[in-house]
Amino acid sequence: MLAGLAATHPEARFRFCYRAHRYLRSWRATLPRNARRSLLAEPLGPRGADLFHGLNQRLPRIALPRSIATIHDLFVMTSEYSTPEFRARFTEQARDAASRATAIIAVSEFTRQQVIAHLGAAPGRVHVVHHGIRALPRADRPREPVILNVGAIQKRKNIARLVEAFETVNADWRLVLAGSAGYGSEEILARIARSPAGSRISVLGYISAEDLAGWYGRCSVFAFPSLDEGFGMPVLEAMAAGAPVLTSNRSALPEVAGDAALLVDPESPEELGKALRDLTKSEDLRRDLAGRGSLRAQLFTWENAVRATWDVYRQVLG
């Protein structure tokens, strides 16, 4: 999105600031002529900018004339899905950003309401800008009897209940989990190891974008029963790839999925299992959801995100 902002507004000058652990990787990307990159070394910078936009809940600890913070989610504050140390650090950063930022961008209306409720931000300062979908290579191939889940192996992603629900699905089907190990993964992997359906469950770990596109293209069902999401990008990626989607009826997921997915109570293995069985048994249901999902995904573009972000910039700059 940053390059898109610079490319669509050649009249403005942009400086993309990276903390040390991201600076070297940033050189892989080519920037528009009106943008340059620099190392963000607090407390020396950034200085001299009319507006600073921080892309997460952490603003530099220096005086900024005008600033925007993007907040993606607050589950670290509101739930026990991370270590106490990380929760304390995140909470301090989010509260600091909410108190100092001229405006806040939330990636969903759900996150906007959380920012207002938990960080005390005035409603007029918090703007919703939905993400666009990243461009993944299209993998056109025959669908297989595979249920795919994409995301970290962690408690928040509700993998243990997904495994329990999968155990009720016809034995012709496989469950494929694509994502790195996260908080609470040991318990989840132990649950998979003792599952009676364990031989039909594949844990891939982290996979490349190319491999991910391949699995989106191969799966016949995409299941994402997460307990808490500030947005839910995998839902839209699966829809864009033509996969029928099952997801949770809470957090930002209904906002993102609309009427193009089966929505279930993620804390009910029975409801989740029934939805999986319905999807695996009915090709008509899968076809209907795939068609609606493809149309839904087209609403979330980076062009829209760039326009909405620039509108917030204009408001802040007056």
Listing of model-derived features with the role each one plays in the protein:
Residues 1-318:
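Carbohydrate transferase catalytic cores enriched for Leloir-type hexosyltransferases
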